[in-house]
Amino acid sequence: MPELQERIRNFLKESKRVFLVTRKPGWEEYKKAAKITGLGIILIGLIGMLIRIMGILVLGG
């Protein structure tokens, strides 16, 4: 049991250190991340659509 408490204590100590180093992203950084994420979703959707169309053409829908 003391080992578990020590592991929890170490985890909390390391977590606190990480939170002290991190910062909240600014509006520009947030917009950039949102644009990149949106483009990634669109790209994956287009690839899936192309694979589906090719499957319909090859296998005869």
Curated annotation (Swiss-Prot):
- The main place the protein resides is membrane
The record gives the membrane topology as:
Single-pass membrane protein
Q: Name one GO biological process term.
A: protein secretion
Q: Where exactly are the transmembrane stretches of this chain?
A: 39-59
Record's function text: Essential subunit of the Sec protein translocation channel SecYEG. Clamps together the 2 halves of SecY. May contact the channel plug during translocation.
Subunit: Component of the Sec protein translocase complex. Heterotrimer consisting of SecY (alpha), SecG (beta) and SecE (gamma) subunits. The heterotrimers can form oligomers, although 1 heterotrimer is thought to be able to translocate proteins. Interacts with the ribosome. May interact with SecDF, and other proteins may be involved.
Name listed for the protein in its UniProt record: Protein translocase subunit SecE
Q: Which organism is it from?
A: Pyrococcus abyssi (strain GE5 / Orsay)
Supply the gene name: secE
